[in-house]
């Protein structure tokens, strides 16, 4: 199918992108084939009039968990027990897989055309990836890690990560993941905000350096990159010293950390969204304890300072929003761009570039997607207003196109309560 997208204003996704009017985007099946001037012969094309809207690359979310919808719970939940129950029989497995697929679809309806999953239930993420690629499922392109590798008492152990007691068990899980044809490997090196037992100890080191090195060495031998959950300065150093390729979340850096990033050639995937509710919400709203709020502020400040320091020192920065955590819904990745602009001080232009072409490059798919250029996948979105002027334009989409599949007037079901709580932090 040949399509011509007319009467739109192009934003190509490059770092210096500027609005380009009077252009027509031509696609054939799942590929962009040309960008031409108005007035060319469009015989043989289905013409889609964009009515003056802004066409930019589809967003790319590099830190996704498809096992949750972001709805905050009234009380703490035993996620490991819930996953054991889900996997206990075929019926509950089937229901859970359908939910995961529905959450992937919500990402797409929210304008995200590529996701990178970094911890999920069993092999659900690679199955979802393959179903989407085969056209059996409406979802973004998926780069999947399946279950992460954690340790007993470690972050997400037993839910979206497997608890490895020793190096042999960690390597056995890596072999299992490789058999599932994952795209990357995920380690849980430190704890998180809610894992801390005391004030001032978020991001406590959980995984021994020897295990990190053993998994990284074997993963690299097999051709995989390794992403690692790290939320403390100590954890970041252990990760980088032992071969990790991307730091997920991040923490405040010193000169030694900067040197390690550069020597390793690693990048940091900034995630401002998950700590924000714990750090900034009133505890009467979040339900967080004084300890959790205190630790949330440490992590929030660490993530923001990590991104700022990285940008100032030429360390690559990616964006993800840790969707699936409380208050982070599958349709609102656009908020992460707003937070990146607000708290890290980047321009709207740079935020959009980071969430499109830069993310694609850092995820290893920059030759396939991330910018509007011939030969790349037909992955783009259309907004009524200019996101370079206000990133909130990305909230309401006129059109989503993923691998050539057109979704007009996408309208994801929204959690109005969560949206209302988060909206003040966009100002």
Q: Where do the PLM segments sit?
A:
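Metal-associated gating/positioning segment near the N- to mid-region
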Residues: 54-131
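Divalent metal-coordination and catalytic microenvironments
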Residues: 8, 25, 30, 52, ...
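Active-site microenvironment of metallo-dependent hydrolases
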Residues: 1-23, 28-29, 36-38, 86-88, ...
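Active-site metal-binding motif and surrounding structural segment of the metallo-beta-lactamase
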Residues: 38-56, 91
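Active-site core of metal-dependent hydrolases
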Residues: 191-304, 318-325, 345-346, 360-363
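His/Asp/Glu-enriched, well-ordered alpha-helical/loop segment
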Residues: 221, 225, 291, 301-386
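Histidine/acidic-residue-rich, glycine-tolerant segments that coordinate divalent metal ions
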Residues: 115-238, 246
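N-terminal small/glycine-rich loop or linker at the start of catalytic domains
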Residues: 63-85, 143-159, 212-213, 281-283
């Amino acid at each position: 199918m040949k399509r011509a997208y007319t009467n739109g204003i192009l934003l190509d996704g490059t770092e210096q992108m500027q609005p380009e009017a009077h252009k027509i985007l031509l696609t054939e099946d799942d590929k962009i084939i040309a960008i031409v001037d108005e007035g060319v012969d469009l015989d043989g094309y289905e013409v889609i009039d964009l009515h003056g809207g802004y066409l930019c690359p589809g967003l790319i979310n590099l830190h996704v968990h498809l096992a949750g919808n972001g709805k905050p719970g009234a009380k703490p939940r035993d996620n490991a027990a819930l996953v054991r129950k889900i996997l206990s029989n075929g019926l509950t497995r089937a229901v859970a897989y359908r939910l995961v697929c529905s959450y992937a679809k919500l990402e797409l309806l929210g304008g995200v055309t590529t996701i990178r999953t970094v911890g999920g239930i069993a092999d659900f993420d690679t199955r979802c990836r393959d179903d989407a690629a085969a056209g059996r499922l409406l979802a973004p392109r998926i780069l999947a890690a399946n279950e992460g590798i954690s340790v007993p008492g470690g972050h997400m152990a037993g839910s979206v990560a497997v608890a490895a007691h020793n190096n042999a068990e960690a390597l056995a899980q890596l072999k299992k993941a490789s058999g599932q044809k994952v795209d990357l490997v995920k380690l849980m090196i430190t704890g998180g905000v809610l894992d801390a037992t005391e004030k001032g100890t978020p991001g406590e080191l959980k995984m021994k350096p020897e295990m990190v090195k053993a998994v990284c060495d074997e993963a690299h031998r097999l051709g995989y990159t390794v992403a690692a959950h790290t939320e403390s300065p100590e954890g970041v150093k252990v990760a980088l010293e032992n071969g990790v390729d991307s730091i997920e979340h991040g923490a405040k850096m010193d000169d030694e950390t900067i040197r390690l990033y550069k020597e390793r050639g690693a990048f940091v995937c900034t995630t401002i969204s998950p700590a924000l509710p714990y750090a900034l919400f009133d505890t009467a709203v979040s339900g967080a304890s004084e300890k959790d709020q205190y630790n949330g502020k440490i992590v929030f400040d660490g993530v923001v300072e990590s991104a700022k320091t990285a940008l100032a020192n030429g360390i690559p920065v990616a964006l993800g929003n840790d969707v699936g955590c409380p208050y982070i819904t599958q349709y609102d990745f656009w908020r992460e761009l707003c937070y990146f602009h607000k708290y890290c001080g980047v321009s709207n232009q740079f935020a959009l570039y980071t969430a499109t072409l830069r993310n694609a490059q850092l995820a290893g798919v920059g030759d396939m997607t991330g910018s509007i250029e011939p030969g790349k996948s037909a992955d783009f979105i259309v907004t009524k207003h200019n996101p370079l002027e206000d990133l909130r334009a990305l909230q309401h989409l006129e059109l989503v196109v993923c691998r050539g599949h057109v979704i007009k007037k996408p309208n994801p079901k929204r959690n109005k309560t969560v949206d209302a709580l988060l909206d003040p932090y966009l100002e």
